[in-house]
Amino acid sequence: MLLVPTPVAWVEEACANTRILLIDHANCEKKAASTALALMFAYAEDLHLADKMSRLAREELRHYEQVVKLVRTLNITPQRLSPGRYADGLRRAVSRAEPQRELDLMICGAFIEARSCERFEVLAPAIAGPVGALFAALNAAEARHKKMYLDLARRVAMRADLEFTRRCAEFAAIEAQLVTEPDEIFRFHSGPPASAA
């Protein structure tokens, strides 16, 4: 699904900057829960989607609580962080017209979860101690969330006779560009640091 691996320069920055990594990861879990709730409101007539998103929102908030617990254990002071460009960069490609919009939102969700999963796989063995252990523990859930979003996307595509494979390929190209282009700020889904370019 993903066209490119996480750049080595990003992994090096993540290992050296676990404070920002954890704070932003907590933000990502909150955003994931918020997105699930927003989809429930946007497609209120779809009870199948509502069931999936309700469960997802609860699980993402439990993950948020796990991250915050570790933040407290490590005596990290929380701070407000500006959002990275990754999710917004993907969502700019989302259609405004239904039912294409719903398909795009599901595909977008799948790519975010897929990249999270890939980064957990890279970070878990690279960061010793409780941070790496947490990422290893969360990895299976991210893979499950990716599959759920893909299944929902296929369901929308079949119901509305939309092109699934082509649209996934278009988002894959955008996603690859977002994670390989240098970034001025370090975030969980950012590209490699601009200073490393």
Please place each PLM-identified region on the residue numbering.
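Non-heme di-metal
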Residues: 1-197
